[in-house]
Design a protein with these regions (language model features):
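A short SAM/SAH-binding and catalytic strip from SAM-dependent methyltransferases
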Residues: 124-125, 134-161, 167
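Short alpha-helix
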Residues: 203-226
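Conserved beta-strand signature within the Rossmann-like core of class I S-adenosyl-L-methionine
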Residues: 145-147, 164, 170-182
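Rossmann-like AdoMet
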Residues: 1-122, 126-140, 168
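Conserved S-adenosyl-L-methionine
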Residues: 19, 220-233
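Short "lid" loop at the C-terminus of a central beta-strand within the Rossmann-like core
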Residues: 151-154, 182-186
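Short, glycine-/aromatic-enriched active-site segment of Class I SAM-dependent methyltransferases
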Residues: 187-202
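Core SAM-dependent methyltransferase catalytic element
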Residues: 231-255
Length: 255
């Protein structure tokens, strides 16, 4: 990445830019790459997990389109990359949300000429403010899908469950919630990984399967339920692969 925009400290690792590095992107700084490499030393399959997460996004959005969803809010969208939500669902109203100024600058530049697509800067830890901004862009009298891919494990419990509850309350029946969430694959080395993220722009909050299931209260999970990314409605032509326990994913419809 070229020089840092005003107000951005390139010496502090940024989780969105680290994720970009895991996806072999170019929008990252030396500090991001160094922190990402430290994570890869502890979790060698992190890049594979990031790709599995993007593959899940593609399949989940296709599912939403087939279910008739015409409005999608992609929370914690991250830096633009290939296979963005609006590309998978070109007829849908798509609003990307991220709190990071670099992410928003890149997103708005990429989407400047795109119709029916917006990039909103907001902090998901302030759901009331977020909803106020979304109401000018989304019709909450109609079903809407909220995507939270690789987001909630960067939010503390008090904010994470409150966010999901308030979005659920604001949406009508027939709306959807899509989540991917990291789990604790290797308890003996996880504390070291947590220390790395403490030096970045967001701390890691790993949860159990039961904790993740709580996010779906008031929703009905679509088959195959809460499962590993590669096992959620996999493409027939694409084999599962060996390393599929990066976290849990689910797509659910509000009752």
């Amino acid at each position: 990445m070229a020089g840092a925009p005003e107000g951005v400290d390139p010496s502090v690792p940024n989780v969105a830019r680290m994720y970009d590095y895991f996806l072999d992107g170019k929008d990252n700084f030396a500090a991001d790459r160094a922190a990402a490499e430290e994570i890869l030393k502890k979790f060698p399959h992190t890049k594979e997990g990031a790709r599995a997460n993007r593959d899940f996004l593609r399949r989940a959005v296709r599912y939403l389109v087939d279910a008739g969803i015409e409005q999608i809010v992609d929370l914690g969208a991250g830096l633009p990359t290939q296979g963005n939500t609006h590309e998978i669902a070109p007829q849908a109203r798509v609003v990307y949300v991220d709190y990071d100024s670099v992410v928003c600058v890149h997103g708005r530049a990429l989407l400047a000429r795109k119709e029916n697509v917006d990039f909103l800067q907001a902090d998901v830890r302030e759901p009331d403010v977020l909803l106020g901004k979304l109401r000018g862009l989304i019709d909450f009298d109609k079903p809407v899908a909220f995507l939270m891919l690789a987001l909630l494990h960067f939010i503390e419990d008090e904010h994470a469950y409150d966010l999901v509850a308030k979005l659920r309350a604001a949406s009508v029946p027939g709306s959807y919630l899509v989540i991917s969430h990291a789990v604790d694959p290797t308890p003996d080395i996880t504390p070291q990984a947590l220390e790395i993220y403490k030096k970045s722009t967001a701390q890691l909050n790993l949860r159990t399967r039961e904790d993740i299931e709580r996010f779906f209260e008031g929703y009905e999970l679509a088959e195959p339920g809460l499962t590993f990314p590669a096992r959620w409605r996999p493409d027939e032509e694409k084999p599962l692969g060996d390393n599929i326990t990066f976290g849990y994913v689910g797509v659910a419809r509000k009752l």
